[in-house]
Amino acid sequence: MAPGPSATQGILLLLPLLPLSQVTLGSADRNCDPSDQCPPQARWSSLWHVGLILLAILLMLLCGVTASCVRFCCLRKQTHTQSHTPAAWQPCDGTVIPVDSDSPAHSTVTSYSSVQYPLGMRLPLYFGEPDPDSMVPPTYSLYASELPPSYDEVVKMIKAREEVAAPSEKTNSLPEALEPETTGGPQEPGPSAQRP
């Protein structure tokens, strides 16, 4: 049976441990007296802590390689499952802050004070507790094949959305302003109701 790729990788990882076996073999020779000249292998036998440090480094490298392989496999499976579901278009929220050239403090105050929201518009609360039921995953992923829109495209999309929202608010408020005010009590609508 031929060794597989994992067996070959295991053998390659064990190659740095080969000098450790020579150190233990050299320490088995007890004929060397400390006063005599000892062969180089026997000198290494007194440095057992070096082998322990090398073994610890090897184990950390092995753990790192294993963790990165597991992470790579999990991310690949995750992007593979996401590619089967069609991505629905989701609107982008963006903030455009105008910058004046007068001074940084003035431009900051001006940009924040010049933003006026309609009364019916719900402001995003950035510092509140997120509701797990309404949380939506981010629109763009780092592993997606397409890039997010550029800054200019986001600004155009926001302006287009504001322009669409602005006329609809104006048309809703116009009929209320054109209705005549009644001076008497409440009138019941019906065929006999007269309009001045």
UniProtKB/Swiss-Prot annotation:
**Record carries keyword Signal:** yes
How does this protein lie in the membrane? Single-pass membrane protein
Q: Which Pfam families match?
A: TMEM52
Membrane-traversing stretches:
47-67
List keywords of the entry alphabetically: Membrane, Signal, Transmembrane, Transmembrane helix
Subcellular localization, as worded in the UniProt entry: Membrane
- Main location per the UniProt record: membrane
Signal peptide range equals: 1-28
Could you tell me which residues belong to the region Disordered? Answer: 162-196
Q: Which GO terms describe its cellular component?
A: membrane
Q: What protein name does the entry list?
A: Transmembrane protein 52
The gene coding this protein:
Tmem52
